[in-house]
Structures are given as C-alpha cells and as structure tokens.
From Swiss-Prot:
SUPFAM superfamilies: P-loop containing nucleoside triphosphate hydrolases, TrmE connector domain. Its main location: cytoplasm. Residues 221-366 form the TrmE-type G domain. Belongs to the TRAFAC class TrmE-Era-EngA-EngB-Septin-like GTPase superfamily. TrmE GTPase family. This is tRNA modification GTPase MnmE. Transmembrane segments: none annotated. Its cofactor is K(+). The gene is mnmE. GTP binds at residues 231-236, 250-256, 275-278. The keyword Cytoplasm applies. Exhibits a very high intrinsic GTPase hydrolysis rate. Involved in the addition of a carboxymethylaminomethyl (cmnm) group at the wobble position (U34) of certain tRNAs, forming tRNA-cmnm(5)s(2)U34. Keywords: Cytoplasm, GTP-binding, Hydrolase, Magnesium, Metal-binding, Nucleotide-binding, Potassium, tRNA processing. PANTHER family: TRNA MODIFICATION GTPASE GTPBP3, TRNA MODIFICATION GTPASE GTPBP3, MITOCHONDRIAL. The keyword NAD does not apply.
Amino acid sequence: MSEIASLQDTIFALSSGRLPSGVAVVRISGPKVRFVLETIVGSIPTPRYAAYKLFRSRNGDPIDRGLALFFPGPNSFTGEDCAEFHLHGGKAVVEKLLSEMGELHGCRIAEAGEFTRRAFSNGKMDLTIAEGLADLIAAETEGQRRLALQVASGTQRELYTEWRQRLLRARAFIEAELDFADESDVPGSVSEQVWQSLALLKSEIENHIASGKRASMLRDGLHVVIVGAPNAGKSSLLNFLAGREVAIISEEAGTTRDLLEVKLDLGGIPVYVTDTAGLRETDSSVEKIGIERARARMADADLVLLLEDMNDPIAVASDEIPEALWKIGTKADLNAESADCWTYRISTKTGEGLDQLLTNLQNFAEEQIGQIEDAVPTRQRHINLLRSTVTEIDRAINGTNLPLELRAENMRLASQYLGRITGDVDVEEILDVIFSQFCIGK
C-alpha cells in the first residue's frame, strides 16, 4: 500500500493490549474520524473531554456503553483528527465494535506502527523519538525504561539537530569565502576557524559513539556465561540465579549439552546468564556440538564465570578464557581450605558465597553501564550514520590539498548523515523497518 493511499484511509485498532481485559481502548485516526463518531456514538464529543456514550452498530443495535474522546488535528498524536473509544474489554464486545468500524467506507484496521508513522509523516515527532517510544513499550527493566524515556523525550533529536546546525554554519562560511572572496565584509582565511570548530565537533561525535556501547548493553542486556568442567556445579548455580529449576542436575557428567539461558533483572539492568556444556574431551558427537557452542558463547560474553570443583579442580585451556573472568570455586561445603586462586568460593548446597556473588554481579553490570545522563546512540543505525558523519568531517578537515568546493561537499554529506538519524533527510527506505517494531494500535 502506498504512503499516499494509506494517509487517505481512516485507521483504527485496539491499542490497549490483549483481551480479555477490564477496559479496552480503540484508537482511530484519519479524515473520517468525525463520521465514525457520529455513526458509532451519535455525535462528536467536545474536544478532549470524555463523554459517556452508548456504542451502536450501523443498524442501531447497542454494542456497549463507555467513553468516547475526540482529538481534532493538528493538535493530536498523529496530527490528524483522532478519537478513542474506551469500553469493556470483553473479546466479543471489542470484536463487534471493530467489525462495525471495518464496514464503514474508507476505514480499515491499522498496520503495525501506523499511528506512529503518521505522527512522523505529519511532523509530530522525528525518528529518534519514534524509536524511543518503541523501546519504552518494549522496556522490561527500570534501566531500559529510563533510557527509552530519555530518548522519547527528544534528547537525541536536540543533540543531533545542534550538531547539524553547526555543520551547516561551517559550510556556509566556506561557501561565503568561495563566493565572496573579494568582498570586504567577508573575513579572510575564515576557513581556518572552520577547521578548528569541525575538529571539536568530530571529537564530540567520537565520544558520543563510544558511549553507544553502554546504551547497547542496557538496551540488549549484558551476557554472562557459566563455563567449566563437567559436574563443576554450573547447572546448580544457574538454578540459584534463576530462582527456579531450569537445568537438570545429575551426578552423570555431560548432562548439559545445549545452552540454557535465563534473564535476570539486576538493579534495573537486564543480564542474560547462560549455562553451557562441560568443557572436556569427548567422543560424543552431540556433546562436542554443545562444547563448540559453549566456546562460541564465551567469545561473545561480557563476563565469564569459570567454575571449578575445589575438591577436584580441572583446568580449562587459558586461550579459551576471555579477559573478563571470575574464577569461582564450587562445593565449598566439602572443602574447608581457603585458596587465593579463586575469586569466589560458593556452595549451592549451603548457600555460602551466593548472595555476595549475586551482589557483585549487579555491581559489575552497573559499572559496565554507568550513569547514562546525556544523550547516547541507542541503535546500530545511529552508530553507522555517526561513523559516516565522522568520516566526512575528517575528510573535510584533512583535505588540505583539495579545493574548498570538495571539502564543502564533505561537510554537506556529513550534515546529510546526521539528518538521516532524525529522519530529516532521505530515510524512506528504512521507515518500514523502524515502524514495524511497533505493535498494532501504536
């Protein structure tokens, strides 16, 4: 469906979530909102005031009683005329209302993210705010909520807009020197000041890119991998961290052959902990696959917990162990000796050391992410476009043997890359990808 055709339709959808529920909210947007209101509830409510109404079918049969609200454009979420129906959240009730609305000429069910896409198309928000809203809806931890709300509040947009304006001003100075070099009111060698300001801007963007790793960890979670020899207590530790039995515990070595993952919320930070197959030499083809997966997951981990039975320690090859490693001695209840070779001593039988380990896992997660107070890039597409921006700025600064016209073009390209982040420039090809992340009704 073309963008132009879809904007001519009036769209509607359940926006309040899965049925049944106590209350259901149906959202409507488009040129026929007033017609829908008159058809379903008999009149158009006073803008922004809830009106208690009887919802009727096209034939006048009652459907339910509830609230109707009207938000005339352009001062609405989408910038168009919008309305909401608040009714009882019974499945049959909502389906009947949606069915009746779908029979009205020019009205159809909204596609995923279509309300937000219309808000973007009508200038009510930029792409970073839309992405922030998507992250806010998907947030599962307090840290994710805070980060998403920050982005949805426009902090990224303000920063990228300011950088883009600085680039445009710098380019204007260069083009003024090109066009009016003979005029007395244009300072000579103004371009030297421009290159200094661009060097500062480049440094700011590079620092901003570096902060993206912390945002990525908060958005996508930290990954902790439990490794060790068979029967080192890996599955027992996973069960403790999960607070339930997710892994089979057995005296038989090699019980765990696939990756088992649980998600923890540690101080508002999502942490994924993975139990892996015991690392050893084996003739079992299935177990070998599990060991290969364990080693691959280790390579991508933010932290590795290397477990060793303190009564029977079996070393794991050092070239398999990443830098971020905690060496944990297990079955401390069977070993009274203290040894400095282990970062922690734990016993899943008596609970020794487990609470301290969990506390330190949370401290580690908080140290990795830190306090995110300033705007940070939250998507890989932001990082890619920011890197392209830096590349063009660098070419402009260091192209001392090139004509000013070419260096000004590098600055124009840098400005365009920044504009693509916010959606101000040439982003049609990525809109479907971004807005498909929303659910129906958003």
